[in-house]
Amino acid sequence: MEKRDRRLGIRVGGLGKLIGVGCFIALGCSFAVARRPESRADKPGIIVRTHNYAGVKGDTLDRAEKETARIFREAGIDTAWVVCPVTSAELAQYPACLQPADIPRFDINILPRFMATQLSQPDTTLGFTSLTREGQRASDASIFLDRIKEEVERTHGSLTGILGDAMAHELGHILLRTSGHSVEGIMRAKWTPEDFRLASRGQLLFTPQQADLMRSEVRERAQAQIAAEPTAASLSK
């Protein structure tokens, strides 16, 4: 079990080192830098920042994140995870959330029931992304914890498994740049009881075609991010 205070650094899932000082049943659609090790530079990676509004226990969230990381590792994408605050007043306590990086970053908001209902999604929706049109590049998603718990109870499944798969599903929408779904795998629209059992056992995955598309998207975002960063020469002017 990880003991380090995750507010102070990035938990790495094969991605790199921290260097520094210190939509239906279903799913809807301080100065430090993080870098990939040279030996894995050809493998795309992302940083996922979690905002735990629902107050999921730390060890439960850790295991769910590791499940999401495993699913993306199977798809050829490394992940690093950062715990971020839920209020601006707490931001100074989470220096890892402010770290600059040349790696694409995404935010996942884990919401309690009263916050989830404000998004006006169907009662069977377990998650939601900020995509408003096909092909859009979004960067954040929300997960509805109470609805996931209801499915865990209904299917006698694993909370960490289903929560981890729900996060992977929503990140999948973002990286595939679509609110659409597939007929098989983790991007199915309506999850059956058997799908929830597979999720609990860690057997819902992205298809090879989806994995290819997501790796390309991560690389394109990383290149665009680097190109948009001001150079040392421009900063000196």
Annotate each language-model stretch with its function:
Residues C29-F31, P44, T50:
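Terminal transmembrane helix and immediately flanking juxtamembrane interfaces
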Residues G58-M167, L171-I174:
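Metzincin-family zinc-dependent endopeptidase catalytic domain
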Residues G45-I47, G76-A80, I186:
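Residues at or immediately flanking beta-strands
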Residues E2, F31-A34:
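Phosphate- and other anionic-substrate recognition elements at nucleic-acid/protein interfaces
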Residues G16-S30:
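Bacterial N-terminal signal peptides
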Residues K43-G45, I103:
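A general structural motif
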Residues M1-L15:
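N-terminal secretory signal peptides that target proteins for export/translocation
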Residues R35-A41, R49-K66, F128-G157, G161-I162, ...:
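Metalloprotease/metallohydrolase-associated module, dominated by Zn2+-dependent proteases
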